[in-house]
Swiss-Prot record:
The keyword Cell cycle is assigned to this record: no
Species in which this protein is naturally found: Pisum sativum (Garden pea)
Record key words, sorted: Amino-acid biosynthesis, Chloroplast, Histidine biosynthesis, Lyase, Manganese, Metal-binding, Plastid, Transit peptide
Entry protein name: Imidazoleglycerol-phosphate dehydratase, chloroplastic
Compartments, record wording: Plastid, Chloroplast
Chain residues that bind substrate: 95, 121-129, 147-151, 173, 195, 243-251, 273-275
Length: 281
């Protein structure tokens, strides 16, 4: 990113004052209010250039060196993550043809067409509430039932997550969220540990929601767990409506996964494990 400060907009303060900027927060004020206004242009997420009367345009600060100076104290204040984490998978069998692309650092874009309308609706929840960009295209033998397409979409999503996470350096690793939807309340807790495990406790009262077989909800989640290598616990705390129970589950899962995949700036890019490595078991 580059920040340009117009020289005519800056008062003539003593150099001793100008050399001690106090950077308070990236999203609101980068300099004391007496320095405003200034023009800002953003180009790169991990690199910035500050241009002031004392800093010619060639002066640049990397994200690792961007610190706050306040009464002699120095601390890293702005975590930058230059690499977009994307996983892309194509899975083809005699039963299905599935393409999945996931951007963990997206904005919630959903583009899903699986031939199973209710599953598309749930994938929209994953994108919207996880702020992931989720693109899923699938064709399959839905004339038989939803089972094969449901399973293979989930297997591909889990593999795409595994790709996108990479070495998992700097992430939170753990996620925990409870989502209400009217009378339904679902709690999800997960660990991107590399060890696949599903603990599933949903009591869905009807066999179908629309044409969607509710028995395959557990199978969908188990398939994601198997290929992504996550530990996933799901608990139903309340709920009577099948649609609400399932949708609250996907919303809670999306928010917990968002927490787990986001960066922890205090880790400074280290692997969140005492072993020093997180890999698919």
């Amino acid at each position: 990113m580059e920040l340009y400060a117009a020289s005519h907009s800056l008062p003539n303060y003593p150099s001793s004052f100008l050399f001690k900027p106090k950077i308070t927060t990236f999203h609101t004020t980068l300099f004391p209010t007496k320095f405003a206004p200034f023009k800002a242009s953003f180009f790169s997420p991990n690199h910035l250039t500050l241009t002031t009367p004392m800093n010619p345009p060639t002066t640049s600060l990397s994200s690792a060196a961007f610190v706050e100076h306040n009464n002699g104290s120095t601390s890293t204040s702005l975590p930058f993550h230059p690499e977009t984490r994307v996983g892309e998978v194509k899975r083809v069998t005699k039963e299905t043809n599935v393409s999945v692309k996931i951007n963990l650092d997206g904005s919630g874009v959903a583009d899903s067409s699986t031939g199973i309308p209710f599953l598309d609706h749930m994938l929209d929840q994953l994108a919207s509430h996880g702020l992931f960009d989720v693109h899923v295209k699938a064709t399959g033998d839905v004339h038989i039932d939803d089972h094969h397409t449901n399973e293979d979409v989930a297997l591909a999503i889990g593999t795409a997550l595994l790709q996108a996470l990479g070495d998992r350096k700097g992430i939170n690793r753990f996620g925990d969220f409870s989502a209400p939807l009217d009378e339904a309340l679902i709690h999800v807790s997960l660990d991107l540990s590399g060890r696949p495990h599903l603990s599933y406790n949903l009591d869905i009262p009807t066999q179908r929601v629309g044409t969607y077989d509710t028995q395959v909800v557990e199978h969908f989640l188990q398939s994601i767990v198997n290929t992504s290598g996550m530990t996933l616990h799901i608990r139903q705390l309340a709920g009577r409506n099948s649609h609400h129970i399932i949708e609250a589950t996907f919303k809670a899962f999306a928010r917990a996964l968002r927490q787990a995949t986001e960066y922890d700036p205090r880790r400074r890019g280290s692997v969140p494990s005492s072993k020093g490595v997180l890999s698919r078991s």
